[in-house]
Curated annotation (Swiss-Prot):
Lineage, highest ranks first: Eukaryota, Metazoa, Chordata, Craniata, Vertebrata
Protein name per its UniProtKB record: Olfactory receptor 2A25
Glycosylation sites (chain numbering): N4
PANTHER family referenced in this protein's UniProt entry, alphabetically: OLFACTORY RECEPTOR (PTHR26453)
Function: Odorant receptor.
Disulphide connectivity of cysteines: C96-C188
Gene Ontology molecular function terms on file: G protein-coupled receptor activity; odorant binding; olfactory receptor activity
Keywords, comma-separated and alphabetical: Cell membrane, Disulfide bond, G-protein coupled receptor, Glycoprotein, Membrane, Olfaction, Receptor, Sensory transduction, Transducer, Transmembrane, Transmembrane helix
Organism name: Homo sapiens (Human)
Keyword flag Zinc-finger: no
CDD domains hit by this protein: 7tmA_OR2A-like
Signal peptide: none
Amino acid sequence: MGGNQTSITEFLLLGFPIGPRIQMLLFGLFSLFYIFILLGNGTILGLISLDSRLHTPMYFFLSHLAVVDIACACSTVPQMLVNLLHPAKPISFAGCMTQMFLFLSFAHTECLLLVVMSYDRYVAICHPLRYSTIMTWKVCITLALTSWILGVLLALVHLVLLLPLSFCGPQKLNHFFCEIMAVLKLACADTHINEVMVLAGAVSVLVGAFFSTVISYVHILCAILKIQSGEGCQKAFSICSSHLCVVGLFYGTAIIMYVEPQYESPKEQKKYLLLFHSLFNPMLNPLIYSLRNKEVQGTLKRMLEKKRTS
């Protein structure tokens, strides 16, 4: 800590600069979205665990994606709802750092899981005869664990670099949760290294993962076009198109937020883009998979019919 500066012990999240009536409206709307996130992803997890036909590598990774989406929403949305009800209620420094660390961990993990899922589809469609020998359960578990461990370690790097910084005021954080770039703006010390690390992490993880995913799907598209069976081609395209929707939503918003130069987009615009990224993406992911995936639809129908007849 530097000299005679008094370190602040809490932050005040400014959230959304709106009137009380609109705040209550948003509270109800975001609460509804939060319930949809928990129900949607929880349903995906339940269907995969209960139906043995979904005990395949693709759905194994999809279940991990559902867990990440739930965890990511739980790390940000409750605090957002508290801010809407009690705009003047501060968050402690420790709470802010914890929230930032958890969000970064889950965001990095989701980024890596999407790469793993694209690789799984690449092997399934481009090398179908070798799929069972390549994507063994040992390999699947290793890939999933690696995604989680790397996600946590990458977030830990940012946290370790941020904790030594002094925060002497102001304590007003222009965001709806403790986002790393918004927190860095309140530091009284030089944050150049931190900003470089955020950019380096975004370029290496986000851009690297994005291009890896694109390369996988280019190969997949070429393989799909060669499939002679119309039904096989339609099934492969249906599965991959749902994956591409999720990939496009995730990487598109994340790259604009952390890779695009700061002067290209207004700060408020990026704040609302992050709202979409942290609130709407986890809600849309299970909808995309359930609406575009006949296997998930079939499992859901069987479960509902079984419940009616019992």
